[in-house]
From Swiss-Prot:
Protein name: Trigger factor
Record bears the keyword Cell division: yes
Reaction it catalyzes: [protein]-peptidylproline (omega=180) = [protein]-peptidylproline (omega=0)
Job of this protein: Involved in protein export. Acts as a chaperone by maintaining the newly synthesized protein in an open conformation. Functions as a peptidyl-prolyl cis-trans isomerase.
Family as reported in the entry's similarity comment: Belongs to the FKBP-type PPIase family. Tig subfamily.
The organism of origin for this protein: Streptococcus pneumoniae serotype 19F (strain G54)
């Protein structure tokens, strides 16, 4: 194989390489044997057409495209490796010569990984805005949240307040004319919940069961029903019941209702304190890691980030997101329907963060390379087993999906992240 690379501009060039006749000839024979099985040529049994007759009737050149499709991927990969390139996007392939009996010549326009000039990435000083300590207020807030989840609604005689639930009938009209979707009966509405358009719930505060209230509101300009958007409406609203939330007493019985594994309120508080401490410690570690990596990226210089890398990152992120949905049993089309979004919206969402993520990935890879990190067979096997456990898959299935090179890359990246993070100190 003949290989050459010509730089055209920063991070771009043309990789020219050949596919030899030693590779082409056996592949021509293989493709011919496959093609002739389906050929019907008068005077010959199906599948028994001699090669010279085929070449005379159809031309050897008619096989070239299939041969090229079979040989090109490995030839390109070998050329990239021989040229010592790190290619970061799909190439633009141009077959410059495909003559009979001659080596074929291919020119590939490639985008190469940009140069990363590392700054300081070890022993960094970082600031984080995450508290590690668990306070009594944290524990009480957690218990109060669970306590409210066990609250019951009880009828009250007094006037409705924010936080109460009212059971109502309502009939809406605009200029005295009722409109579709503006009527409801025995509807339970939490005051202050924001379920209804702005101003509706506020006008029921201070009223009691048995009262009828004329609620005057204006539909927002961006309201989903365009025929109602921006218009003033009157809702004749009858309050049937006012209900207040009644929370259970804060005692040992509540603790057992919240968590059957505890006997007392003190036990529950201690359990929550430990859980919150573990969660805060994890959040603190994540914050330190994020701050340290961000600082390492800021300290580095990347020579002209190719736009193709950003596109590749967006594509990868979208595919990863959609793959996670499917692993959870969620159909992507159903997700877009429920959320009222499109795949284009998803692309735009990831586009905003793709440049930052691409820079981060490049810097971490550069750190791994600078430190000479590698992965042993034992580490690769351990990574496979961990992935199999995480995704409830067979080890063999993980191995079939991920190459050893991909696993090695992931392990070295983890080592680089660990180095940057473990040597950082918090101001």
């Amino acid at each position: 194989m003949s290989v050459s690379f010509e730089n055209k501009e920063t991070n771009r060039g043309v990789l020219t390489f050949t596919i030899s006749q030693d590779q082409i000839k056996p592949e021509l024979d293989r493709v011919f044997k496959s093609v002739k099985k389906s050929l019907n040529v008068p005077g010959f049994r199906k599948g028994h057409l001699p090669r010279p007759i085929f070449d005379k009737k159809f031309g050897e050149e008619s096989l070239y495209q299939d041969v090229m499709n079979a040989l090109l991927p490995n030839a390109y990969e070998a050329a990239v490796k021989e040229a010592g390139l790190e290619v970061v996007a799909q190439p633009k392939i141009d077959v410059t010569s495909m003559e009979k009996g001659q080596d074929w010549v291919i020119a590939a326009e490639v985008v190469t990984k940009p140069e990363v000039k590392l700054g300081d990435y070890k022993n960094l000083e970082v600031s984080v805005d995450v508290e590690k300590e668990v306070t009594d207020a944290d524990v009480e807030e957690r218990i109060e949240r669970e306590r409210n989840n066990l609250a019951e609604l009880v009828i009250k005689e007094a006037a409705a307040e924010n936080g109460d639930t009212v059971v109502i009938d309502f009939v809406g009209s605009i200029d005295g004319v009722e409109f579709d979707g503006g009527k409801g009966e025995n509807f339970s509405l939490g005051l202050g919940s924001g379920q209804f358009i702005p101003g509706f719930e506020d006008q029921l505060v201070g009223h009691s069961a048995g009262e009828t209230v004329d609620v005057i509101v204006t539909f927002p300009e961006d309201y989903q029903a365009e025929d109602l958007a921006g218009k003033e409406a009157k809702f004749v609203t009858t309050i049937h019941e006012v209900k207040a939330k009644e929370v259970p007493a804060l005692d040992d019985e509540l603790a057992k209702d919240i968590d059957e594994e505890v006997e007392t309120l003190a036990d529950l508080k201690e359990k929550y304190r430990k859980e919150l401490a573990a969660a805060k410690e994890e959040a603190y570690k994540d914050a330190v890691e994020g701050a340290a990596i961000d600082t390492a990226v800021e300290n580095a210089e990347i020579v002209e980030l190719p736009e193709e890398m950003i596109h590749e990152e967006v594509h990868r992120s979208v595919n990863e997101f959609l793959g996670n949905l499917q692993r959870q049993g969620i159909n992507p089309d159903m997700y877009f329907q429920i959320t009222g979004t499109t795949q284009e919206d998803l692309h735009n969402q990831y586009q905003a963060e793709a440049e930052s993520r691409t820079k981060t990935n490049l810097v971490i890879e550069a750190v791994a390379k600078a430190e000479g990190f590698d992965a042993s067979e034992e580490e690769i096997q351990k990574e496979v087993e961990q992935l199999a456990a995480d995704y409830n898959m067979e080890v063999a299935q993980v191995q079939s999906l991920l190459s050893a090179d991909m696993l090695k890359h992931d392990i070295t990246i983890k080592k680089a992240v660990e180095l940057i993070t473990s040597t950082a100190t918090v101001k």
